[in-house]
Amino acid sequence: MTVHPTWVFDSSPIPDPHGRGERAVKFFRALKHPKSTAPKNAFELAPFWERILRRIYGPSDASGNRQVRTVYIQIPRGARKTTFGAGLGLLHSCGHEKVPGGACILAASAEDQAELAFDEAKAFIKATPALARATHIVDSELKLEHLASGSNLRAIPAEGDVQQGKTPYFVLIDELHVWKSRKLWRALKSGLLKVPNTLLVIITTAGRGQDNLGYEEYSYARKVATGEIVNPSYLPIIFEPPAKFD
């Protein structure tokens, strides 16, 4: 198994002129998780996830606008992608990346997966006193709200109501390769274009076959990763056998 690009595991510098990457890392390190075995249930941020955080949020222009707008992460099972994705949702709904009234979405392939994503976000909140005080959870709607800013985070299934994805500020897509319907995908992508400084993050394991959304996005991500397509706003991170990049 290898990863492309190689900066994920090396010590090369990652630009962070406005400190947004460092703030993102500090937010994750301040989180607590009930399943953590670290002292005081501190969330253990793996070094490669930290590098990814810094690469998403660090590079920015002179005005502080984030360079990256879309992130594609293809990663093997067991890497805690659902937990990391929930943390990103909290960063944008309750942390330094939140905006007043911002709509943040965790979109999964099915209802049970949406519930799993929301449960991870809820676990962070209940174990982290500062977040517990700052938020209101509505379990029946798989939704939480940051009380002071009105920003909210909602988990929805791919076959859910497309109206829920009208104008999101942050979207995390889980396991795109098993999405059967394209309606919500199109609605979310269209909605992101209506709001400034949005972020779309796709986190998935490798899929099978080529007739699906996941393969289409993987194909584009791979072309960016290999330099065939130049798109600084698109960040591909692909874990797969070395032969794939020969």
Locations of regions flagged by a protein language model:
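Phosphate/NTP-binding elements of NTP-utilizing enzymes
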Residues: M1-D246
